[in-house]
Amino acid sequence: MSRTKSVQDYIRTIVDFPHEGILFRDVTTLFADPRGFRIAIDQMLHPYAGERIDKVVGLEARGFILGGAIAHQLSVGFVPIRKKGKLPGTTISQDYKLEYGEAIVEIHDDAIQPGEKILLVDDLLATGGTAAAGIKLVERLGGEIVSCAFIIDLPDLGGRKVLESMGMDVHALCAFDGL
């Protein structure tokens, strides 16, 4: 008898992408499979059953796919956090460090109201830089992060520790060792 596939079984690993020595964890194979995608969304929702969540915030770009599906299931709004210059209207921005240099993400300044309970989602937690910047944006608007949810955690890169040091609750469906 075959065992039931786990979320991790649906994720493809691509060697040496985007650079030599990197094992790229490709969630597009998970998204493309209806059963795999359903399992992932259901498992991402499970820890928050009965908990108040007012909006889901998704980090660009795969966090939009997950965040939209999760917000739909929760019957709440979805808010994107995007790279600088991609949102129309008035925004606030937050810079964060990359391996080589810096980047900036933005959110509409009216997307979250003070006191709203927010679930932050993305596909992968690596160093935690993008998620930490997203958390800061939400908090600057007065939102309260209920939790941060990811499909994949790369524990060797320390992102979970970064977010937990900010007082965040962190959930990931699976973890992969290495880079």
Curated annotation (Swiss-Prot):
PROSITE patterns: PUR_PYR_PR_TRANSFER. One of its GO terms (molecular function) is AMP binding. Its EC number is 2.4.2.7. InterPro entries: Ade_phspho_trans, PRibTrfase_dom, PRTase-like, UPRTase/APRTase. It catalyses: AMP + diphosphate = 5-phospho-alpha-D-ribose 1-diphosphate + adenine. SUPFAM superfamilies: PRTase-like (SSF53271). Keywords: Cytoplasm, Glycosyltransferase, Purine salvage, Transferase. It comes from the Bacteria. The keyword Electron transport does not apply. One of its GO terms (cellular component) is cytoplasm. Pathway: Purine metabolism; AMP biosynthesis via salvage pathway; AMP from adenine: step 1/1. GO terms for biological process: adenine salvage; AMP salvage; purine ribonucleoside salvage. The keyword Cell cycle does not apply. Its main location: cytoplasm. It is an enzyme of class 2 (transferase). It is found in: Cytoplasm. Catalyzes a salvage reaction resulting in the formation of AMP, that is energically less costly than de novo synthesis. Homodimer. Belongs to the purine/pyrimidine phosphoribosyltransferase family. This is Adenine phosphoribosyltransferase. The gene is apt.
